[in-house]
Amino acid sequence: MNASGEYDSTSGLAQWANARYAPETSAECSSLATPAHTDESLTILTTLPEARAAVNTAASAAQRMISIYTPDLEPELYDQTAFLEIIKRFVLSRSFSKVRVLLVDPARVLRDSNRFVAMGRRLSSYIDIRYVAGHAPQRASAYLIADDRAIVYRLRADTWDGIADLNNHAVARLHLNEFDNVWNASAPDHALRVARRG
């Protein structure tokens, strides 16, 4: 507001408040720090087909690494032919590529047949699956991060509601740092390795 009590849309505070929702149009706004992504890269997810499409799109965009945090390798997402083909192409076309998976509750993976685990057995130098260590912080969320740019994130793993942002380095990096901390605290579990061979 200016001295006469009217709303002043050119003030720095007003520009900051509106920066998230309005495109930058003036030179004064250019000095504000803005994320390196566009609203077009953000998608709201509410259904399983939307979640599948987002996971497939993000994984297809990966160049170096895919990191997955999941309760049980959610077969509705990760045991699907389209996703498995994307992962296979990803790891076989790049000698330096890596897929890392953190499992919160591996009981279902050990009990049920899972094609992703079978692929991990065949391509063990590219696909690494670990259990979340008991002392590591566990989240109710589930997510996939491609490199350090694209993320498909669901606040609760028991629902398909979430977001997909294919070009948000800051948010992807934040969750990747969290993933790395849990990854480093979680050693590969021998039970899954035995299950892979059996």
Which sequence ranges carry the predicted segments?
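Long, hydrophobic, amphipathic alpha-helical segments used as structural scaffolds
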Residues: 70, 98, 103, 127, ...
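HKD (HxKxxxxD) catalytic microenvironment of the phospholipase D
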Residues: 128-172
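Signature of lipid phosphatidyltransferase scaffolds
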Residues: 2-32, 155-198
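Amphipathic coiled-coil/heptad-repeat helices and related helical stalk/stem segments
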Residues: 51-52, 83, 175
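Primarily the HKD phosphodiesterase
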Residues: 58-123
